């Protein structure tokens, strides 16, 4: 059967006719019917594209998102079977996005123009027009007419979602999909659409997960994530996603995007551009800074600085800014964390920066102190670095910072690091005070650690910082609040000794009392949790005191050594328990093997045989499954080889048809895509080499010919040059003579004019002063007149504005009074109509009541008549007619004739109804 004949121009003509008569909805529906019809499967997609473009223009103009979505999905369904159809889908999608962005820009410009229009002389949102906007339907005050823009924003966002879902996970539409993703992110950034950006990020993750899932299936046009170009596009999308997340302030979404980028970087074999990677590390540093992770913030800034050095447009001011920021970020890192047991979450975050382990503060400081970075930092930053990285004296710290902080406050990069630097400085001041003072008044301690602005803290905040330092095991102290004295301790086990003795005495007294009251009982010893911990700490203290260097170490070093020893002991306990468990498992296995040497019963033999048969059966089934998998794999390999051979043959024919190189088609069977690329490159390189050799020979030949020409032309050119030189010298001399003569004449004329003017110059000055004096009063009069006119114009304008506002107020009041009178008339009319309606209802009700009573009376009369009729057996005798002459007497045997029957009188309708009702009763 031949395909149907399509006339796309007729559909466009029909749509234009409907639009011209004011029926755009009908035009849109007609185009939708044409696009969704199955006939277009047989058409060339390029011929259908104008109809789809017209359909999109109408749909965007009418804001019919659902209709557009249905049309695009149906169009893709009909044309996706061919590569040309998918290209058409990409072109249609790009056109749709262009239309919606253009429309969104025009609507936004229109809204901005409406907001910028001044409503009165004051303009803007004033208290008066705010009150007016409450009761007026036309809320034209700026800031109240954003609903139209919001609806277009929602429509634009739904359009982006539709296009992304239309293009997702198709290898032929990857480039278009990537472009739409970038434009969608720019849309969210431009209009500050945070919620839409979150949904966009989730959608992109779902698309990537679907692409990963499709890798296991052999579908047509599946996205190949092993392709470097495809993977690079996904990576660029995620890096842009990180950038937009940071600009929008979506830090959680930025962190999730960083995870996506790290995953894609681990899969990629191609390094990103240094500029892109530098921007990525800069955004990562911002994310870590917001999360108060100053350690990784500094590492990320260091990686950014290393990449930024490759920027050819970077200036010395930029290097100074970023170097100073990097040094401050390193100084903001808190003291090196003490060893912890278990999983450290920072180890995973360090993996995002391609670090094998979590760095320490000392390592970061050492890297920052490199001359390339430190030498470019500002001088105040260098001084702060030298101050905080030395064992400063708490007594002189305040004076040093007082002269240094004002210089740093003027730097833009210093503000964001004030809080972490303050925390680090105060904590280090407490550590220094704990080393310098054994005990000190609380007020004196706060006086020593009170730093100048912006490092100043209240006494309550200082006490909180001191307690936080103790909780983190950087200092240990006891506070006597009665005396207001703080006592620092140099040994972390110092409090343990006193508390141990006290608790031991308490336990001894409790044990004595228990024995006195329960002499006959012998309870088992019970170790409480506190006593067990205390015992373990005492043993740890004894072991550490025997360690070299422990007695003379600082408090922090002692805590670090204690924690390392605890970690070592815990690891030893875990290893011993693991070894014991393995030993128990080996013992159980040995006992099982030993028990198997006992002679078995007949039942056990049968069970063993059945078990063996079951195992053999399972092994046979496993072999059969493995064989089936092997055959399926071989079949799949053969199919792939056939497809590869067909593809290679097609590519070889295409490359041979171009005529640049020739490849034997017989080699298609043993050729892969990589071999084809390599062979093509080799052949092209060989042809290029031959061409280069021929071109080089030709260039040499042309060079020799040119040399011969120039050798013959050289004497002629020399003669011509000598003649030209003589002609130029002659022309120069003539021109010089003319210029000298003209200059002399001009000079003489100027001297003559000067002599004439010098004679009349005093007269000119006298005349000038006379004219100025004469015109001065006139000028002042004109100025006064103009000032009066200006004042009169101002007053007239003010009066006009007041009169205009007064007229507007009078008109508004008249409108209000007219509206009120109209409402009163309407209300009176309504009341009158209500009264008339009630009166009619009352009259009708009375008539109904009278009719009911009349009906009851009639029914009673009818019942009475009926009873009377039933009580009388014969009808009443009618009166005889008037007497006539008596007839003659008849004989006795003569029969008397009976009178003729009288005709019955007809009953009326009312009488019939009465009789019928009486019969029913």
Curated annotation (Swiss-Prot):
Subcellular location: Cytoplasm
GO cellular component: cytoplasmic stress granule; eukaryotic 43S preinitiation complex; eukaryotic 48S preinitiation complex; eukaryotic translation initiation factor 3 complex, eIF3e; eukaryotic translation initiation factor 3 complex, eIF3m; incipient cellular bud site; multi-eIF complex
Sequence ranges of Basic and acidic residues compositional bias: 506-517, 818-865, 903-913
Matching InterPro entries: EIF3A, eIF3a_PCI_TPR-like, PCI_dom
Compositional bias annotation for Pro residues: 873-890
Keyword Metal-binding: no
Molecular-function GO term, any one: mRNA binding
Pfam families in UniProt: eIF3a_PCI_TPR-like
GO BP of this protein: formation of cytoplasmic translation initiation complex; translation reinitiation
Keywords attached to this entry: Coiled coil, Cytoplasm, Initiation factor, Protein biosynthesis, RNA-binding
Family per record: Belongs to the eIF-3 subunit A family.
Name this protein carries in UniProt: Eukaryotic translation initiation factor 3 subunit A
């Amino acid at each position: 059967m031949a395909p149907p004949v399509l006339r796309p121009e007729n559909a466009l003509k029909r749509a234009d006719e409907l639009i011209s008569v004011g029926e755009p909805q009908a035009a849109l529906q007609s185009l939708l019917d044409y696009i969704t019809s199955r006939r277009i499967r047989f058409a060339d997609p390029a011929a259908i594209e104008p109809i789809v473009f017209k359909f999109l223009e109408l749909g965007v103009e009418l804001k019919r998102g659902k209709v557009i979505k249905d049309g695009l999905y149906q169009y893709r369904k009909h044309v996706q079977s061919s590569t040309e159809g998918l290209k058409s889908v990409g072109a249609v999608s790009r056109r749709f996005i262009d239309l919606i962005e253009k429309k969104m820009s025009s609507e936004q410009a229109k809204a901005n123009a409406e907001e910028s229009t001044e409503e009165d002389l004051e303009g803007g949102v004033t208290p008066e027009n705010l009150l007016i906007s409450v009761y007026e339907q036309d809320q034209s005050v700026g800031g109240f007419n954003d609903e139209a823009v919001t609806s277009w924003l929602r429509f634009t966002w739904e359009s982006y979602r539709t296009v992304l879902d239309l293009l997702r996970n198709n290898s032929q539409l990857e480039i278009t999909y990537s472009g739409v993703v970038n434009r969608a992110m720019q849309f969210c950034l431009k209009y500050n659409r945070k919620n839409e950006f979150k949904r966009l990020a989730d959608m992109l993750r779902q698309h990537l997960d679907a692409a990963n899932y499709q890798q296991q299936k052999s579908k047509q046009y599946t996205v190949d994530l092993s392709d470097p170009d495809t993977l690079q596009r996904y990576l660029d999308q995620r890096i842009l996603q990180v950038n937009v997340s940071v600009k929008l302030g979506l830090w959680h979404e930025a962190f999730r995007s960083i995870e996506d980028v790290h995953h894609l970087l681990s899969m990629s074999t191609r390094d990103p551009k240094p500029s892109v990677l530098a921007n990525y590390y800069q955004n990562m540093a911002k994310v870590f800074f917001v999360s108060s992770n100053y350690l990784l913030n500094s590492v990320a800034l260091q990686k950014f600085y290393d990449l930024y050095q490759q920027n050819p447009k970077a200036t010395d001011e930029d290097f100074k800014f970023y170097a100073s920021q990097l040094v401050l970020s390193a100084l903001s890192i808190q003291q090196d964390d003490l060893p912890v047991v278990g999983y450290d979450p920072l180890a995973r975050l360090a993996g995002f920066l391609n670090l094998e382990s979590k760095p320490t503060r000392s390592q970061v400081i050492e890297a920052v102190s490199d001359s390339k970075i430190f030498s470019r930092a500002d001088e105040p930053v260098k001084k702060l670095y030298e101050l905080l990285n030395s064992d400063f004296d708490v007594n002189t710290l305040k004076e040093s910072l007082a002269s240094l902080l004002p210089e740093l406050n003027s730097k833009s990069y210093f503000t964001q690091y004030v809080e972490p630097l303050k925390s680090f400085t105060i904590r280090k001041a407490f550590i220094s005070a704990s080393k310098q003072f054994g005990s000190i008044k609380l007020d004196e301690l706060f006086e020593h650690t009170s730093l100048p602005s912006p490092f100043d803290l209240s006494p309550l905040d200082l006490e909180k910082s001191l307690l936080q330092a103790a909780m983190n095991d950087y200092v240990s102290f006891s506070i006597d609040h009665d005396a207001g004295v703080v006592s620092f301790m140099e040994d972390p086990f110092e409090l343990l000794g006193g508390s141990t003795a006290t608790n031991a005495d308490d336990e001894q007294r409790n044990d004595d009392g228990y024995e006195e009251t329960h002499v006959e009982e012998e309870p088992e010893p019970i170790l409480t949790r506190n006593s067990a911990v205390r015992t373990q700490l005492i043993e740890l203290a004894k072991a550490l005191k025997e360690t070299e260097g422990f007695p003379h170490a600082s408090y922090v070093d002692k805590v670090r050594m204690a924690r390392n020893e605890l970690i070592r002991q815990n690891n030893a306990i875990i290893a011993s328990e693991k070894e014991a468990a393995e030993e128990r498992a080996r013992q159980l296995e040995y006992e099982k093997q030993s028990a198997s040497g006992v002679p078995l019963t007949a039942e056990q033999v049968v069970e063993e045989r059945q078990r063996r048969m079951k195992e053999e059966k399972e092994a046979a089934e496993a072999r059969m499954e493995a064989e089936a998998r092997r055959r399926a794999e071989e079949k799949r390999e053969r199919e792939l080889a056939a497809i590869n051979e067909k593809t290679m043959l097609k590519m070889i024919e295409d490359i041979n048809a171009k005529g640049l190189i020739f490849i034997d088609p017989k080699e298609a069977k043993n050729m892969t895509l990589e071999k084809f690329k390599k062979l093509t490159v080799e052949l092209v390189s060989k042809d290029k080499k031959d061409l280069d050799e021929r071109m080089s020979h030709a260039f040499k030949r042309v060079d020799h010919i040119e040399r011969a020409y120039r050798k013959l032309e050289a004497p002629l050119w020399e003669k011509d040059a000598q003649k030209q030189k003589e002609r130029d010298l002659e022309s120069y001399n003539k021109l010089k003579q003319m210029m000298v003569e003209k200059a002399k004449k001009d000079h003489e004329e100027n001297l003559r004019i000067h002599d004439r003017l010098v004679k009349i110059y005093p007269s000119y000055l006298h005349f000038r002063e006379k004219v100025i004096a004469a015109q001065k009063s006139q000028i002042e009069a004109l100025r006064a007149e103009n000032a009066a006119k200006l004042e009169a114009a101002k007053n007239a304008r003010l009066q006009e504005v007041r009169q205009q506002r007064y007229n507007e107020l009078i008109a508004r009041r008249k409108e209000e009074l007219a509206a009120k009178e109209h409402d009163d008339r309407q209300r009176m009319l309504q009341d009158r109509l209500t009264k008339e309606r009630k009166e009619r209802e009352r009259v009708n009700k009375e008539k109904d009541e009278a009719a009911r009573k009349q009906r009851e009376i009639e029914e009673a009369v009818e019942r009475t008549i009926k009873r009377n009729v039933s009580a009388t057996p014969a009808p009443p005798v009618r009166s005889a007619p008037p007497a006539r002459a008596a007839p003659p007497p008849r004989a006795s045997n003569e029969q008397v004739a009976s009178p003729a029957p009288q005709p019955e009188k007809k009953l009326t309708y009312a009488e019939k109804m009465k009789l019928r009702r009486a019969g029913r009763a």
